[in-house]
């Protein structure tokens, strides 16, 4: 009975406290009597070896497909400009019209176009073809002022949302990012009644 009790306690002790190797400052200590000076020398030697190895090159895993947050440092450049310095194309897509304003990063107006200024009248202003034509016209005016890349900010739920972006790319502008800035009420004003067809 005593032998069984001793072997059981040995199993419990070996399971609870597994044997470990003595490691001090990343260097295994061969004996307990190793002097402090030898341990410091071994740790210093290891630090020198780590410092001599070159830093690894940035990997593809650190690259992000998403544009940087304004104010965040990034190495990405478009035509030599940072993300915050790229002009912005504001698209307001209502159900009756689509308006496009291209402004500089400092919010100075560069180009403006809408479906009405492109010759569409009445109900035709609210179509996708009219929005695409307005996008091409706004892109042509902006490229005439030296704009090559734009950030797009879309507001509204009209039928010309995507057509206007397509028109900007067809007009020669390269779209860097698309932001949806549509206002969403948190149960604000009462909406208009539904149409009966």
UniProtKB/Swiss-Prot annotation:
GO terms for molecular function: structural constituent of ribosome. The keyword Mitochondrion applies. It comes from the Eukaryota. Residues 43-66 are annotated as: Disordered. Gene3D superfamilies: Ribosomal protein S11. GO terms for biological process: mitochondrial translation; peptide biosynthetic process; translation. Keywords: Mitochondrion, Ribonucleoprotein, Ribosomal protein, Transit peptide. Residues 43-52 have a biased composition (Basic and acidic residues). SUPFAM superfamilies: Translational machinery components (SSF53137). Its main location: mitochondrion. It is found in: Mitochondrion. InterPro entries: Ribosomal_uS11 (IPR001971), Ribosomal_uS11_CS (IPR018102), Ribosomal_uS11_sf (IPR036967). One of its GO terms (cellular component) is mitochondrial small ribosomal subunit. Belongs to the universal ribosomal protein uS11 family. Component of the mitochondrial ribosome small subunit (28S) which comprises a 12S rRNA and about 30 distinct proteins. This is Small ribosomal subunit protein uS11m.
């Amino acid at each position: 009975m005593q032998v069984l009790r001793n072997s059981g306690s040995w199993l419990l002790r070996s399971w609870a406290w597994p044997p470990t190797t003595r490691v001090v400052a990343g260097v295994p200590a061969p004996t307990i009597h190793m002097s402090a000076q030898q341990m410091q020398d071994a740790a210093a030697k290891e630090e020198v070896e780590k410092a001599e190895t070159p830093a690894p090159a940035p990997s593809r895993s650190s690259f992000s497909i998403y544009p940087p947050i304004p104010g965040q440092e990034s190495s990405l450049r478009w035509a030599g400009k940072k993300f915050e310095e790229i002009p912005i194309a504001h698209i307001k897509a209502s159900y009756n019209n689509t308006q496009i304003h291209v402004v500089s990063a400092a919010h100075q107006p560069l180009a403006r176009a809408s479906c009405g200024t492109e010759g569409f009248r009445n109900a035709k202003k609210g179509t996708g073809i009219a929005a695409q034509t307005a996008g091409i016209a706004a892109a042509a005016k902006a490229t005439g002022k030296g704009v090559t890349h734009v950030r797009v900010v879309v507001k509204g739920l009209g039928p010309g949302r995507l057509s206007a972006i397509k028109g900007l790319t067809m007009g020669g502008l390269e779209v860097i990012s698309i932001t949806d800035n549509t206002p969403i009420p948190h149960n604000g004003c009462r909406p208009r009644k539904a149409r009966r067809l």
